[in-house]
Amino acid sequence: MKDRVDRKGVKEIVRILRDELPQLRERYGVRSLGIFGSYLRGEHRRRSDLDVLVELDERRLTLLEFVALENYLSDRIGVKVDLVEKSTLKPAIGRRILEEVRPI
């Protein structure tokens, strides 16, 4: 799977996520997405996952819905996605993620 993403690059990942955003808003209540971590910095390895920050609307997803969203994104992008909900960020690491994140 990693090879597909390497050929696409970050621009292609952003395009895929941007194209999916309207459906994600309707189906899961996604307000915004952003990528951060090793893929964004160009430091990913063969088994690296893609870190995606998600902000959801006021409705709460069940654990199964959250996992379904994570799996859907993994399938669409072609690499394992690690989905992080913005409202659950701890102060110290949250600051670092928010400084690094590339909004979609």
Question: Where in the sequence are the language-model features?
Answer:
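Short hydrophobic/aromatic beta-strand micro-patches
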Residues: L53-E55
